[in-house]
A protein has these predicted regions:
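Active-site cofactor/cluster-binding pocket
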Residues: 1-189
Length: 189
């Protein structure tokens, strides 16, 4: 089983991200479970969503404490140890972060590999608003191979429904996928 933890602020689309990722895995014949965790948070408060992917039925329904992968929608969460973004991330795990800067500035935060993608910039350019969550899914597909880009695209169309919205989101996910597919995955220690 592969476990994924998504870090974002309320209103940044973490729940949508988890749902689309689970839909894409299901499209490929895998089992998936996606769910959020938040309390009485208001818009902008840190929150998490979780996804479990497996080739057999997913029974475990607790929060993910030792993820194989983390996705960070809001880079300010990764920049502070207060939010525990890297807590429990497996040493051979992977952090995919919405970040336009140099990955070396994040290297001391975890022993796991880090991949960055300027998801906010991609979203602003293509969608006209900072919806970094969907481009991060493209980065996830390219960096991990856990879901195929075609399955993600289909899940996006199913999730958003409206052709114009879905088409732009597919373009954003594809752009991030292509950017990350060109990066070498080297451990930053």
């Amino acid at each position: 089983m592969k476990e994924i933890r998504i870090h974002a602020r309320a209103g940044q689309g973490a729940i949508t991200t988890a749902r689309i990722l689970a839909m894409a895995a299901f499209e490929q014949g895998r089992y998936a479970l996606a769910f959020p965790h938040f309390g009485a948070e208001r818009m902008g408060a840190p929150m998490n969503a979780f996804v479990r992917l497996d080739d057999s039925k997913v029974q475990l329904r607790s929060r993910v404490h030792a993820p194989d992968y983390i996705l960070v929608v809001d880079p300010s969460l990764a920049a502070s140890s207060d939010f525990g973004v890297f807590d429990g991330l497996k040493p051979d795990g992977l952090a995919i972060i919405n970040y336009a800067g140099d990955v070396d500035t994040l290297a001391g935060m975890t022993k796991a590999k880090i991949v960055t993608v300027p998801a906010s910039e991609i979203a602003l350019e293509i969608l006209g608003q900072d919806r970094a969550n969907v481009p991060l899914l493209g980065a996830f597909a390219a960096a991990t191979g856990e879901v195929k880009i075609e399955a993600l695209e289909k899940a996006i169309v199913q999730n958003f429904g409206e052709v114009k919205v879905a088409t732009k989101n597919v373009e954003a996910v594809r752009r991030a996928y292509e950017m990350v597919a060109g990066q070498a995955l080297t451990a930053k220690r």
